[in-house]
Amino acid sequence: MLDGSMGPTKQKAARLVVDLASTAGASEFVQVENAHVSGVSVITGGHGLRRFLSDLSGDPQGTVSIPTTLNSAGCDHEKMDEMGIDYPDFLEQQFEIVHSYSELGIEATLSCTPYDRGVAPVDGIGSWAESNAVCFSNSYTSLITNRESGLSALATALTGWAPKWGLHIEGNRSPNILVTIECEMLDTADWSVLGDWIGKQIMPTWDLPWGPMPRIVGLPSASFEMRKALTASAANYGCPMLWVDGITADAPEVYSYEGEITFTKADLRERYRELAPRGKVDLVVIGCPQASVGEARETAAAVRARMELGEVISDNRLWLFMSAHNYELISGDGTLDILEEAGALVLKDTCPEVTPYNRSKYNHLLTNSLKAEHYLTSGLNRIPTSVAPIIECVAHAFDDTLVDGPAPDLAGATAKPFATAKTHQDSPFEATGRGIPSQDQWEVSGRALVTDVPITYLGYVNRDTGVIEEPGHPLDGSSIKDTILIYPKGSGSTVAPFVLMGLVYTGFGPMAIVNRDVCPLTLPAASLLGVPYAHGFDEDPTFEVNTGDSVSLSLSDGKVSLLVDSRTTEV
């Protein structure tokens, strides 16, 4: 494959797999059973995704080597009018993307819950690129998968191989955070709040090479929906796997944790207070990740109780998102009839976080999911979003007067600053790191943009300007354009490489990238587009280089030299 004998598409994929292996320090490759590819919606993949898929077209040998499924699209194409999407050529662009993936031999399941599709439980090695699915499957099933990006999963799908690294290695599958629960957790939304809360406690000084991997003690027995809600929201902050005493397999014994935290009744109450709706709710969205049959039935039960009082939902103020598989199941048991009779809109093939909302109608959403809230409030949609249990969500869908007043304003919200351990450095600094096999030699110099906090590309880096737009982040308001960008690794959505590729295509990307940690969210874009990329330094550049320093980087014989030419005077 590397020599191009199997076509240019598989050659590109093989080069990327080799680059990932080199970066991860993998000494061998593993055969992979199946893959799940993210980056489907027009608003997530954007220009970078469409151009990349276009570049792959026309190669008859460029089809996947293993069974591969596809993540959620940005709409239910049968209900475009009801969704009111106001986005030029959205449906045409969406069809183009899905068709391009289908041409690669990928099954267009259009679901972000590949673990909930009625097939026998999968095991072995997978290459999955939907963050909630990665965390769910590693935690509750026998499938082993690293937290792949959309591009790294696609490369493995095309080749059938992945580097053996990360969670493929048993010794790396152990907890690094201990979480003690000291409150009742009775509602599914409580579990969603918990997963997100854990991520918010992470300190930059904690050594979490594979991401936060908590062991949680003190939780009661859990339904499928509770377990799903926990792993989905934990994945907001890069969690690829977790353990829950009495629910998952026993956690390996560790002698010390990077952090030990306690979640109390006061913490749960405070988060609900912070997340409660302030101002009129315009739309209720349930199903992020796409709703299970159990979630649909719970929603229908709450809806039926209001219907029996003679109430109806006006203007389709409740949207329930599902996979096509689960949609078919509820259409056969009466659940769909109840929801639609009440006035709810039940959608398939899409998800709340990847849908472009019509802002002439919807400026304040209510959901039961912290995963939805995390991405809906980001730059992806930048729409104020509140959180409550399903029964409260349904109440707001029926009665738009429960909370009065204007929609909340995200611009006016005060974000808690991210924890950072960076201090200003004045001493001379030079370090040696490594490049990637697909890059032979380069030299760059320029202004450094540096943080010790991971960067979340999807939703928090403006795909048009390259400006980081994440309140509380140390680099909030800074542009990555034409910088030497130095940071630990990417975080958040596995669609990150397509956002970065789009910025590089349009001239708003960095001139070079330095990662401290192994980063399958960043490396693929650099590998495929030839952006100078360095990693594995003998000293941590995220602490030793200041934003504003003049820096030189050079690659020769696989080694990268990083030199601070002059220090910034700004502190």
Which sequence ranges carry the predicted segments?
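Intein/HINT protein-splicing elements and their conserved insertion hotspots or analogous self-processing inserts
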Residues: 402-432, 437, 555-559, 563-571
